[in-house]
């Protein structure tokens, strides 16, 4: 799947509107929009990293991003959602009124909605690189090849997490 490139933001800051709570050690890239409509809120816990141009728009409830979660560039979260501890959302992932469990991983360009069950790939760490995993509709993401390596790399790059 081809994903269009993200344009660099005009501003080197992020924008927050409404009831938005951000922990002191959160890393937020330029061009991020955090919008909480009336009677809604956004909570971002310690150690979260939000990538360039992401949009988090709370409507009709809360969006809660738990400690250590990583949102890559261009992520869109709309409605009500919980992103679990140490979850990783791939670039240009869209969540609409749905949540990701702790440690969950989404592929770049994923679209997850409360109306349709997520489709995730189940891959064991013993599979050789280059094989395409079979997709199956399941309720929660499962083990993803390379997750342990990613977590070690993130720990070495960001030791305070």
From Swiss-Prot:
Induction: Carboxysome size and components vary with growth conditions. When grown in ambient air at medium light (50 uE meter(-2) second(-1)) there are 74 units of this protein per carboxysome, the numbers decrease under low light and high CO(2), and increase under high light (at protein level). One of its GO terms (molecular function) is structural constituent of carboxysome shell. InterPro entries: Trimer_LpxA-like_sf (IPR011004). The keyword Protein transport does not apply. Residues 116-137 have a biased composition (Polar residues). Heterologous expression of 12 carboxysomal genes in E.coli (ccaA, ccmK2, ccmK3, ccmK4, ccmL, ccmM, ccmN, ccmO, ccmP, rbcL, rbcS, rbcX) leads to the formation of bodies that resemble carboxysomes, have densely packed paracrystalline arrays and RuBisCO activity. These structures open the door to generating carboxysomes in plant cells to increase their photosynthesis and productivity, as well as tailoring bacterial microcompartments to specific metabolic needs and molecule delivery. Transmembrane segments: none annotated. One of its GO terms (cellular component) is carboxysome. Keywords: Bacterial microcompartment, Carbon dioxide fixation, Carboxysome, Photosynthesis. One of its GO terms (biological process) is carbon fixation. It is found in: Carboxysome. Residues 111-140 are annotated as: Disordered. Changing residue 146 to D: In hcrO221, requires high CO2 levels for growth. Its main location: other. A motif (Encapsulation peptide) lies at residues 144-161. The N-terminus interacts with CcmM, while the 18 C-terminal residues (encapsulation peptide) are required for interaction with the hexameric shell proteins (CcmK2) and are predicted to form a helix. The 2 regions are separated by a linker. Interacts with CcmM via the N-terminus of CcmN. Interacts with CcmK2 via the 18 C-terminal residues. Required for carboxysome formation; the N-terminus interacts with CcmM which itself binds RuBisCO (ribulose bisphosphate carboxylase, rbcL-rbcS), while the C-terminal 18 residues interact with carboxysome shell protein CcmK2. Required for growth in normal air. Beta-carboxysome assembly initiates when soluble RuBisCO is condensed into a liquid matrix in a pre-carboxysome by the RbcS-like domains of probably both CcmM58 and CcmM35. CcmN interacts with the N-terminus of CcmM58, and then recruits the CcmK2 major shell protein via CcmN's encapsulation peptide. Shell formation requires CcmK proteins and CcmO. CcmL caps the otherwise elongated carboxysome. Once fully encapsulated carboxysomes are formed, they migrate within the cell probably via interactions with the cytoskeleton. This is Carboxysome assembly protein CcmN. It comes from Synechococcus elongatus (strain ATCC 33912 / PCC 7942 / FACHB-805) (Anacystis nidulans R2). The gene is ccmN.
